[in-house]
Design a protein with these regions (language model features):
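N-terminal secretory signal peptides that target proteins for export/translocation
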Residues: 1-16
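Hydrophobic alpha-helical segments, especially transmembrane helices
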Residues: 16-19, 123
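Bacterial N-terminal signal peptides
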Residues: 21-31
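Transmembrane beta-barrel domains of Gram-negative outer membranes and organellar outer membranes
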Residues: 36-267
Length: 268
C-alpha cells in the first residue's frame, strides 16, 4: 500500500535550506553507540509523508508468540509472549518535512504487567512526491527518552536513511539505519531494513521485509549473534486509512522465532 503515509503534491527536490535542517538533526545524532534492546516500530519507511497541515495517527503493535526467554540486558523485558507498541502522531509541516511524536511506548509483558517504556520525537525529511517518482529518498531522525527496563541508556537516537525505486507494480526500498546512545561514533549500531513489494492496484500490496541488527559499525557481531528476521506483509487501504499486518520468522539464534506486527493508520 504505497500511499499509506499520504503523498504530498508539491513538485520540488530537497533544497539547501531543507538539507540544513536535516544536518542539524544529524548533528544531534552523531557521537553515539547503542545496545539494541526492544523495538516498538517494525516498519520500512517509503519517503511518503502526511500532507502539509494534516495529522495522521499510526498505531503500532508487535507480539512475540515465540522468542527469546531472556532479556537483552539485565532488568530488561523478556521478548517471549510480550506485546509492545505505540501510537505514532504525525503532522505534515511542509511538502518535505513531517514531525512525529511516539507516545506512549508501552509493553504488556508475558506475565500480564502493563509498562510505560519510552517517548520519542521524530523529524522526517524527504523528497516531495515520492509516490510519483521512480527514484525517491529521505532521512529520518529520532530522539528517545527511555525507562530503565526498555533501554539501559536514558537517551537514545536513530538515523534512518530511505532509498527506493518504483518499478511498475514493484517497489524496492532500503532503510540503512543506525541506532545510538550518544557514546561514540565507532559504536553506532547498524540495523538496516529492506522491503520488496508488489502492488495490486491502489489498495493492496504484498511484501517481503527483512530487519537486521549487525552490531557496532566498528566491529560487526559474529553471524550467530546477529539478529535477522524475515516478514511476510500485507497492506490494505488508502492514503487516509489503512492497515498493515506481518508475520516474521527469525533466521538466527539471536532472533525471536516468531513475531507478529500490526499497524493501523488513519488521517485525523
Amino acid at each position: 500500500m504505497s500511499e499509506r503515509r499520504g503523498a504530498a503534491r508539491h513538485p520540488a527536490s530537497l533544497r539547501p535550506r531543507q538539507w540544513a535542517c536535516a544536518a542539524l538533526w544529524a548533528a544531534l545524532c552523531v557521537g553515539m553507540s547503542a545496545a539494541r534492546a526492544q523495538t516498538d516500530e517494525i516498519q520500512v519507511y517509503d519517503a511518503e509523508i502526511t500532507a502539509p497541515g494534516h495529522f495522521n495517527l499510526t498505531w503500532h503493535n508487535n507480539f512475540t508468540p515465540s522468542g527469546r526467554t531472556e532479556p537483552a540486558f539485565p532488568g530488561g523485558i523478556v521478548p517471549e509472549h510480550a506485546l509492545n507498541g505505540v501510537p505514532e502522531w504525525a503532522y505534515g509541516v511542509t511538502p518535505w518535512f513531517e514531525a512525529g511524536l511516539y507516545l506512549p511506548v508501552y509493553t504488556r509483558t508475558g506475565d500480564g504487567e502493563l509498562l510505560f517504556d519510552a517517548a520519542k520525537l521524530r523529524a522526517l525529511f524527504v523528497v516531495p512526491d515520492a509516490h510519483d517518482r521512480r527514484f525517491f529518498y529521505g532521512i529520518n531522525f529520532e530522539l528517545s527518552y527511555n525507562t530503565p527496563h526498555w533501554d539501559p541508556s536514558r537517551y537514545t537516537g536513530e538515523m534512518r536513511g530511505i532509498v527506493g525505486v518504483h518499478l511498475g507494480r514493484f517497489d524496492l526500498i532500503l532503510n540503512p539505519n543506525v541506532d545510538t546512545d550518544y557514546n561514540g561514533v565507532g559504536q553506532l549500531e547498524f540495523v538496516p531494513a529492506v522491503r520488496v513489494a508488489w502492488n495490486s492496484g491502489d489498495k493492496l500490496a504484498l511484501a517481503l521485509e527483512e530487519y537486521a541488527d549487525f552490531g557496532p559499525l566498528e566491529h560487526f557481531k559474529p553471524s550467530e549473534q546477529q539478529s535477522h528476521t524475515l516478514f511476510a506483509v500485507i497492506d490494505y487501504g488508502t492514503a487516509s486509512r489503512g492497515v498493515e499486518f506481518g508475520i516474521g520468522r527469525g533466521l538466527t539464534p539471536a532472533s525471536d522465532t516468531w513475531v507478529l506486527k500490526l499497524m493501523l493508520m488513519q488521517d485525523l
